[in-house]
């Protein structure tokens, strides 16, 4: 058993050692993955009346939303343990709010659902990769981003509730709901086009397949006119394939 475990360990070590490149090697690494994105200090206050007619103030904190990321890294092996890379990526970021409901003095219920902001960036990460174990590296650098679009949407509705707890929506002549609709917003003119952030994380390479996990925290405000310091914060998970040149 000990010989078997030792043989397996040696085999794994040899396999991961293959991920270490010769000094001077250039590599192309296409990657795709998913973002879990949020925006700091992007909170809202919703006021209404609670069922006992008391003032109801609800603070809604932004939540993480999923988004696509994909692009290409060009990597150079500078020394045995250190490589540098530059990349270009399309990155979908933003945030979302959980559903909410408030009640006014006339006992009309107002709900919001599917509230989210979608920020599409072209990002340029410049990274240093330091090998900590064969096949495993710690990565850190700086990332510049250019905002391509900034859009939001919210599904809104209002209704009354009878004594039996049944909801009633107002309808038009054709049976359509009068106060249940989706609003869309374009926030590009209120947003800063350029963004600077710091990405840090780890990557694991096995047989030219590389798994990368990063946390990206923004250094610059994304909004132009509000005093709150709203900044990007993103968890990024990608898978790529290394083509050595």
Model region roles, listed by residue range:
Residues 1-31, 239-245:
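Bacterial Sec-dependent N-terminal signal peptides
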Residues 2-6, 10, 68, 72-82, ...:
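N-terminal capping/interface segment
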Residues 20-81:
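N-terminal hydrophobic targeting segments
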Residues 21-23, 77-81, 133, 207-209, ...:
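Outer-membrane beta-barrel channels and translocator barrels
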Residues 30-34, 68-76, 88-90, 124-132, ...:
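Residues on the lipid-exposed face of transmembrane beta-strands in outer-membrane beta-barrel proteins
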Residues 38-65, 93-120, 147-195, 199, ...:
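Extracellular/periplasm-exposed beta-strand and loop segments of Gram-negative cell-envelope proteins
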Residues 71-106:
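Mid-chain, structured segments of secreted extracytoplasmic proteins
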């Amino acid at each position: 058993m000990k010989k078997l475990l030792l043989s397996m360990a040696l085999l794994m070590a040899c396999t991961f050692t293959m991920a270490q490149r010769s000094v001077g090697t250039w590599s192309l690494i296409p990657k795709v993955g998913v973002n879990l994105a949020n925006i700091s200090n992007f909170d809202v206050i919703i006021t209404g009346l609670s069922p006992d007619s008391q003032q109801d103030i609800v603070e809604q904190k932004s939540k993480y939303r999923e988004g696509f990321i994909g692009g290409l890294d060009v990597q150079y092996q500078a020394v045995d343990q250190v490589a540098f890379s530059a990349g270009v990526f399309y990155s979908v970021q933003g945030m979302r709010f959980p559903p909410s409901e408030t009640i006014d003095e006339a006992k009309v219920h107002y709900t919001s659902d599917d509230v989210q902001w979608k920020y599409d960036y072209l990002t340029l990460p410049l990274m240093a990769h330091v090998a900590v174990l064969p096949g495993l590296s710690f990565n850190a650098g700086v990332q510049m981003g250019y905002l391509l679009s900034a859009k939001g949407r919210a599904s809104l509705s209002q209704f009354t509730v009878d004594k039996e707890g049944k909801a009633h929506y107002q309808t038009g002549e054709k049976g359509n709901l009068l106060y249940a609709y989706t609003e869309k917003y374009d926030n590009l003119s209120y947003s800063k086009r350029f963004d600077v952030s710091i990405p840090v994380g780890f990557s694991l390479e096995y047989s030219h397949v590389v798994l990368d996990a990063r946390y990206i925290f923004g250094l610059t405000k994304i909004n132009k006119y509000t005093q709150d310091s709203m900044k990007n914060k993103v968890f990024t998970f990608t898978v790529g394939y290394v083509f050595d040149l």
